[in-house]
Regions:
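Alpha-helical scaffold domains
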Residues: 1-160
Length: 160
């Protein structure tokens, strides 16, 4: 577990503070990895060429870390992998549709959306239409993903 900060393992107050900020759903395992470490893991998964197999495992809720559901960090890394892979927009949006049900707190949502640099390089009108469908959803995090994507990538004079 070289990516887990020692302080998270040894300092109960720090660990509880970290968990309280994340506000995960009950039963979600938190390893304590920081975002730079998760980005490194995501980039390694993409670079390995095995990213599709890993996404399939995550879709089936098969964690990297053994038994049980996906950890908070695995959900974060899943989103980062989607952001880092070089695929056509239609394929990326399909991956996003399978990822969004795994989004269960603000940190996963906002981390994914703010690291979605591909939005700036793709057909912004097509992505906007997709975002509109997300925002109109009654699902809390599906709607939030749409809102945060729009705030992160469409809040400019050109789009207002």
């Amino acid at each position: 577990m070289g990516f887990v900060p020692e302080r998270f393992l040894t300092d109960e107050r720090y660990r509880n503070g970290h968990i309280n900020i994340l506000a995960p759903k009950s039963g979600t395992k938190i390893l304590g990895m920081h975002t730079p470490e998760m980005k490194k893991v995501a980039k390694e998964i993409v670079k390995s060429g095995d990213w599709q197999k890993q996404i399939e495992c995550w879709q089936q809720h098969k964690p990297l870390c053994g038994a049980g559901g996906l950890t908070h960090e695995e959900r974060m890394i899943w989103g980062l992998v989607i952001n880092y892979v070089k695929v056509p927009l239609a394929e990326r949006l399909q991956m996003l549709d399978t990822f969004i049900p795994a989004v269960d707190n603000w940190a996963i949502c906002d981390n994914f959306c703010c690291n979605a640099k591909w939005v700036e390089k793709e057909d912004k009108e097509q992505i906007w239409q997709y975002i509109v469908t997300l925002i109109s959803s009654e699902d809390e995090f599906r709607c939030r993903v749409g809102l945060i994507l729009s705030l992160a990538h469409y809040l400019s004079d050109d789009n207002l």
